Structures are given as C-alpha cells and as structure tokens.
C-alpha cells in the first residue's frame, strides 16, 4: 500500500468474500494501523466472480465521478447486499468432498437424480432448491 499511496491519496481494496478467504481479515487489520487511517478502505466483496466484478466496475465508475473512497465504501457495501448468484450443480460429489453433505446423502441424491441449486449471497453458500434432473434446474428460472 505504501507504493500506491505515493501515487494516490486513498486506496479502496475489494478482496473476495471473507467467508472464502482470509484476505479481507488481513487487509482489515493492516488498514486499521495508524499510518493507513483514512487512507486505506477495505470492502468485503461478500462474493466472487460476476458480483465481485460488478462491485469493482461500480467502484471505478464512482471514482471517475469524483466520489471519495469512504463514500464508495458505503455505496458498495449497500449494493453488495442485493447481489445473489444461483448455481445448478450436475453432481453432488463436490458437496460431499467439501463436507456440505454426507456420503449417504450424496448416494441417495445420486440414485434419485437430485440436482441442487446453490445460492451464494453475501458470503453464504446454501442449498436453495433441489431439482429432479439437471433439465429441471435449467427450466427452474424462478429461484
């Protein structure tokens, strides 16, 4: 941050969701140090992929409009709460490996051809809906 602060007055750092990485916590601790007070602002993206990219594009637009990093932080945190990703999974294998479901649940789900729709919202990943077959997931657009 020291090199960036030689060129810029303020830094706005947007790491991926704190639920998925320790980058936010580390950056938050560093930003709280006296030398970075009111100079470095850290936003928990609460997501990854497209919603995180959208937050970054919004931040760039706000910078170009002349907003301060502190103002952008507030705006980004508010809009972050409205972003949701839905993902239809074709296999239960990764949920089993990640400990989200048991081996027996994965076995039964596979036998019944259950395909979960996952909801990723502000750092939380949950099973939103269960479908019978992947085509039902694709047809089910009213999440």
Name these PLM-found stretches.
Residues 4-10:
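Glycine-rich phosphate-binding loop signature in dinucleotide/nucleotide-binding domains
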Residues 10, 19-41, 47-57, 61-143:
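Mixed-charge interfacial surface used for oligomerization/domain docking
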Residues 13:
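Glycine/small-residue-rich loop that forms an oxyanion/phosphate-binding "nest" at active or ligand-binding sites
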